Amino acid sequence: MVKACAVRGALCAGLFFLAPAVLRAQDVIGIPVGETPPPVTLENLNGDSVPLSRWIGKKPVIVEFWATWCPICAELLPRMEAAQRKFGDRAEFLVVAVAVNQSKNTVRRHLERHPMPFTFLWDGNGAAVRAFQAPSTSYIAVLDSTGKVVYTGVGEDQNIDAALERAAGTPRAAKNPR
């Protein structure tokens, strides 16, 4: 009995001391903050090759990994549109349509029915997914004007404005910029 209590106590203490490390590990989503993604060439929806370097390294860039079937991506849309109205003159908004359970034609048809004010790019071979280490759709990476990642996040609860303010060099108190 005493031995079992000692083992349980040791396990609880170990878990207590490991918990912060586990939580920090969970904060790393996709490409680490401070890194620069490798060069990537995608396609526009007309099939033309487009290097991301056309935008990256010139001014802040927000990249969202998106799919027509992603409900969280749809929930992020109003925030993305509001951020574009606020930062559109100081940042580029790129949406990378991933080739998971959708085709380029599906994306094109979706955008004809539901126009969005962003630059859409097609990641048919997963090059951008690999470069940004995107774990899922609704993943967002924000890069500053030097091309370094200043924020990554996934899901509907992202503070896009704070991330863009950090990228643009106008930080303010933010709930969850990473």
Language-model segments: residues:
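Bacterial N-terminal signal peptides that target proteins for export
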Residues: M1-L11
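Bacterial N-terminal signal peptides
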Residues: G9-P20
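N-proximal helix/coil linker or "cap" segments that precede and/or mark the start of modular domains
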Residues: V22-P39, G57
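A short beta-strand-turn-helix
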Residues: V40-P60
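Short pre-active-site segment immediately N-terminal to redox-active cysteine/selenocysteine motifs
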Residues: K59-V61, W66-W69, S136
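Structural microenvironment flanking redox-active thiols in thiol-disulfide oxidoreductases
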Residues: A74-H114, G124-A131
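Thiol/disulfide oxidoreductase modules built on the thioredoxin-like
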Residues: E112-P117, G124-R166
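Non-globular targeting/processing and membrane-anchoring segments
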Residues: T170-R178
